[in-house]
């Protein structure tokens, strides 16, 4: 019953947010390039998983529908105890294919919380709970321990080709060697920033560089990259793969990028990088996020990795819970393999493939700035 009440409360919250998300589609058959230009950065999964067709920058991200399951029917006005499954052998699971829901444990960043991360929670096997769907959006998928979680690997993916997004349709960021959708580790650009920023340290030909943070509005388009030495005490330079170097190269300088005719020339010893010319998406206003529109912990990463089993993100022992706004106080109970999510308070929002993800909860920054 506890799980049902949380799901129902989530449905009410999503009704309030209907104006923001009701017209948003994660992926679709009819519109190509939708992810790159018109989609907001925070996207909830649509209620009809079969509409998710173009979910990929790689075969691992393709949508592969599994065998449909029969959902228990509920008569309006009745309680969970009176629900009658249409099939005694049906399993209350949600078909979300490889565009799956991923849940991140809701706890403060390491070393900043007075309470440790809460242990994983499971549902009692004696109380099967039906998944509740808030049309037109999937709110949650509550499963019993007997409901197996299908983690699709590349071997399980069908032969359907993944949608390749053109470089100029991608989200802003730093991309590796012209591979669509592959993003180097580092922070996002602020909306008013120009396309280059300092990359300290030695740059290897295949080592992703940790960018030092969002650049300020006064950053010039090209800045010097400090790298290895070319001769004596003269600093040498190397170039990130896929970033366009221009101008004359000094001895021992190297590049694996491809110059682009449209890129303006710069002085010797500098580098320029190309950022797709699209507008940075902005956080929906009901979330109460200010500044440049991103959570404090939003960062690019090449992969998310395994994010763990089914847990409840609404923890009563969280040090920030009493200070968070009610509109974000609901939990999503779901089991899945990695799909980028943004953690806003106690809420988890799915992001389209290759967009932004939040690996650590911005709970601390929320409380420090607003409370």
Swiss-Prot record:
Residues 1-22 form the signal peptide. It comes from the Eukaryota. Residues 65-95, 229-270 are annotated as: Disordered. Its main location: other. Glycosylated. Residues 65-94, 255-270 have a biased composition (Low complexity). The keyword Plastid does not apply. One of its GO terms (cellular component) is polar tube. It is found in: Spore polar tube. GO terms for biological process: sporulation resulting in formation of a cellular spore. Coiled coil: none annotated. Keywords: Glycoprotein, Signal, Sporulation. Involved with PTP2 and PTP3 in formation of a polar tube through which the infectious agent is passed on to the host cell. The host antibody response is directed against the post-translational carbohydrate modification. This is Polar tube protein 1. It comes from Encephalitozoon intestinalis (Microsporidian parasite).
């Amino acid at each position: 019953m506890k799980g049902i009440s949380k799901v129902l409360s989530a449905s009410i919250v999503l009704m309030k947010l209907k104006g923001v998300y009701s017209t948003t589609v994660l992926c679709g058959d009819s519109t190509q390039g939708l992810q790159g230009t018109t989609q907001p950065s925070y996207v909830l999964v649509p209620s009809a998983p079969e509409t998710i067709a173009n979910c990929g920058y790689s075969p691992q991200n393709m949508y592969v529908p599994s065998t449909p399951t029969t959902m228990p029917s509920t008569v309006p006005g009745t309680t969970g105890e009176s629900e009658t499954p249409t099939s005694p052998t049906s399993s209350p699971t949600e078909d979300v294919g490889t565009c799956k829901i991923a849940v991140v444990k809701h706890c403060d960043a390491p070393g900043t919380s007075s309470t440790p991360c809460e242990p994983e929670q499971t549902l009692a096997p004696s109380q099967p709970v039906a998944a509740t769907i808030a049309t037109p959006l999937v709110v949650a998928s509550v499963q019993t321990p007997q409901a197996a979680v299908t983690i699709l690997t590349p071997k399980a993916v069908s032969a359907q080709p993944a949608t390749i997004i053109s470089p100029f349709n991608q989200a802003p960021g730093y991309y590796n060697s012209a591979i669509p959708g592959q993003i180097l580790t580092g922070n996002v650009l602020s909306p008013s920033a120009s396309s280059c920023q300092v990359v300290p340290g030695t740059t290897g030909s295949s080592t992703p560089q940790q960018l030092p943070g969002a650049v300020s509005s006064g950053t010039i388009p090209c800045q010097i990259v400090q790298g290895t030495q070319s001769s004596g005490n003269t600093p040498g330079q190397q170039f990130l793969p896929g970033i366009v170097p221009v101008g004359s190269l000094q001895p021992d300088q190297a590049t694996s990028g491809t110059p682009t005719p449209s890129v303006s020339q710069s002085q010797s010893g500098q580098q320029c990088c190309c950022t797709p010319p699209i507008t940075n998406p902005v956080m929906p206003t009901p979330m109460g996020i200010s500044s440049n529109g991103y959570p404090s912990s939003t960062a690019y990463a090449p992969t998310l990795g395994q994010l763990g089993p089914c847990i409840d993100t609404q923890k009563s022992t969280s040090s920030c819970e009493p200070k968070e706004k009610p509109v974000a106080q609901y939990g999503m109970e779901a089991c899945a393999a990695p799909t980028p999510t943004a953690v806003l308070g106690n809420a988890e929002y799915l992001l389209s493939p290759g967009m932004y993800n939040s690996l650590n909860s911005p709970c601390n920054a929320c409380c420090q700035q607003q409370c």
